[in-house]
Design a protein with these regions (language model features):
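Beta-strand-turn-beta hairpins that frame and shape the catalytic cleft
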Residues: 1-7, 79-88, 128-134, 158-165
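Short secondary-structure boundary/capping segments
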Residues: 29, 51, 77-79, 107, ...
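Active-site neighborhood of phospho(di)ester-bond hydrolases with catalytic His/Asp-centered motifs
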Residues: 8-10, 37-43, 60-65, 89-91, ...
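N-terminal active-site segment of His-dependent metallophosphoesterases
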Residues: 1-54, 68-76, 149-150, 184-187, ...
Length: 209
């Protein structure tokens, strides 16, 4: 089936002595292999990370508060249309209970989106609220602001009318446990048809036809 496989990463902080993400292990490279596009939620921190990522696929970045450099692939806000899904990206996206339209007004200047991608917190997040999929892929290198270790990424599979989103753990590193809580969400024609948290299926909303 035609479609786009999109990798989501964010907050790629690296120890000062690390020269490439490969030195943390092969897991991130393996995850990025074969995707069609990479969306980075900001805090690239070190510019060479963008070139490293782009060996796998084109990359688009929402500039983070630690990204004090210019790059044509990076902007404070990004807006993309992929397979009929409108995707907004901004770095500072913190959990809050206000209605999503209020969140979009602040984060995206009121632009309507189907998917809102952010970063900053280093904590994974995946929810469907007020008709919008909200995703924070966490951090692959500094999850939950713990010491440097393997963390989380996310994957979006997009086809017209169908979306599958998943938070993915990169595994454990050097005896350090990964604090990730895996989760996934699947939409068909903007309706949830599957949703899980830490491997447990969640109740689905009831829709009136």
């Amino acid at each position: 089936m035609p479609g786009m496989r999109v990798a989501l990463i964010s907050d790629t902080h690296l120890p000062s002595l690390i020269r490439t993400p490969d030195e943390l292990g092969p897991q991130l490279a393996a995850f990025l292999t074969g995707v069609d596009l990479i969306l980075h939620g900001g805090d690239v921190v070190r510019p060479f990370v963008l070139d490293w990522c782009e060996q796998f696929a084109p990359i688009v970045v929402a500039q983070g508060n630690n990204d004090d450099f210019d790059d044509p692939r990076m902007a404070r806000r990004q807006l993309l249309d992929i397979e009929g899904w409108r995707i907004g990206m901004v770095h500072e996206l913190r959990p809050e209970d206000r209605p999503v339209p209020v969140l979009l007004e602040r984060a995206m200047g009121g632009e309507r989106v189907d998917v809102l991608i952010g970063g900053d917190t280093h904590v994974e997040r995946l929810e469907y609220r007020d008709g919008v999929v909200v995703i924070n892929s966490g951090s692959p290198t500094l999850p939950h602001h713990k010491e440097f270790r393997l963390g989380t990424v996310a994957l979006l599979d997009l086809t017209p009318g169908r979306l599958h989103a998943e938070i993915v753990s990169l595994g454990h590193s050097h005896g350090s446990p990964n604090p990730t809580v895996p989760r996934h969400l699947e939409l068909l024609e903007r309706r949830i048809i599957a949703h899980s948290h830490d491997g447990v299926a969640l109740a689905l909303p009831l829709y009136e036809d």
